[in-house]
Each structure stands twice: as C-alpha cells, then as structure tokens.
Amino acid sequence: RETLLAALDAAEARGPGTLQYDRGYQPPDYSKVDIHLQPGGYSGEPLAGFLYDFGLKVFMGGAADKDFVAVNAARAAGVPVDGQVHRILDLGCSAGATTTALKRQHPGAEVTGIDVSAAMLRYAHLRAIEQGVEVHFRQMPAESLHYADGHFDMVLAMLLFHELPATVGRRVVEEAFRVLRPGGTFTVL
C-alpha cells in the first residue's frame, strides 16, 4: 500500500501531461455509493485507480488488456465533419485508459480527462506517465464544466451515465453541448 501511494505522490509533478486536483474537494454524493462493489465508491479510497484498473481486467476477461476496450472507444468517437480536432474532453475518465487512447488516436490534439475522484485522476496521471502519453487530468464534475463555450472539438463519455442520477445526466449532456464548438461531436459509449 505504502509503495503504491508513494508512486502516486512522486508522479504528481512529473510529465508528460499534467494533473490538477484539490485535496479539499468534496465529491458529489452520487459518487460515494458502492458502485461496482467498491465500498464507498471511487472517491474515498486513495488506491481506487489501481483497484478499478486491475478489477476491470478481471471483469472483462482479458478484453481490457492493452486497453482494447478504450482503444476501440477512441476509434469509435465521432470526429467533426471538417476533420479539425485540436481539443478533446473525456468526461468521467476514471483510470484514464480512454483518455490516453484518444491521444494516441489524435496525436496532434490536446486531450483532457476529467473526473470527480482525485484517487482515479492520480492513478490515471501515473498510468499516462508510464505510457509516455501527454494528456491532462482535471478534477471537476461533468455537470459543471470549467471551460468556455465552444472550447472543444470532441467530447466523449465512456461508461459514465450509468454512474449518475438521471437529473445529473441531463446536466452533463447540456454541459457537453455547451463546451462543444459548432460542428463538434459528442460521443456517448
């Protein structure tokens, strides 16, 4: 446990990519439920990212190896008709597999993953560093994005909506469209 926590701490100031979160942030109550058999959700346990990532590999029966699911999600994400992809947002990025896959699919784009769980973001950042992929991770709720209108070319939500109450899900959709530029794409998988 201490070794893993030390690795997360050491990665915080390293790159490529960046990590921003607030140690005093209180995640929304909906994130604290025992989802996927994780007691207290993925916000309360500092090693939640490790638990999620390795648990997913077991649950998916090997399909999560080499980020197979995330790579296919990145390939399936809609690209604007004009082909211009400069900024991509991954909503509810969890362990960051889809975030890094999006960067590999669109190497010239700035890719940002957001999540309410600092533990997940810290792991996602460590994972991206280990893979040498420059992506950015920010702590914020998908229903209240801290970006200007029209900022992104693409927004993706991979396996996010089953984690949210319906009222929050509607706000997430509104926010996704708000931060998309005209002609941008919003993909829900």
Task: Briefly describe each language-model feature range.
Residues 154-167:
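A short SAM/SAH-binding and catalytic strip from SAM-dependent methyltransferases
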Residues 1-43:
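N-terminal auxiliary segments of SAM/dcSAM-dependent transferases
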Residues 38-42, 48-67:
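Class I SAM-dependent methyltransferase Rossmann-like catalytic core
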Residues 51, 64-84:
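Conserved alpha-helix/loop element of class I SAM-dependent methyltransferases that forms part
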Residues 143-155:
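A short acidic, Gly/Pro-enriched loop at the edge of an enzyme's catalytic core
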Residues 183-189:
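Conserved beta-strand signature within the Rossmann-like core of class I S-adenosyl-L-methionine
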Residues 87-89, 95-144:
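Class I SAM-dependent methyltransferase SAM/SAH-binding core
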Residues 170-182:
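A short glycine-rich, Lys/Arg-flanked "PGG" loop and its adjoining helix->strand segment in the class I
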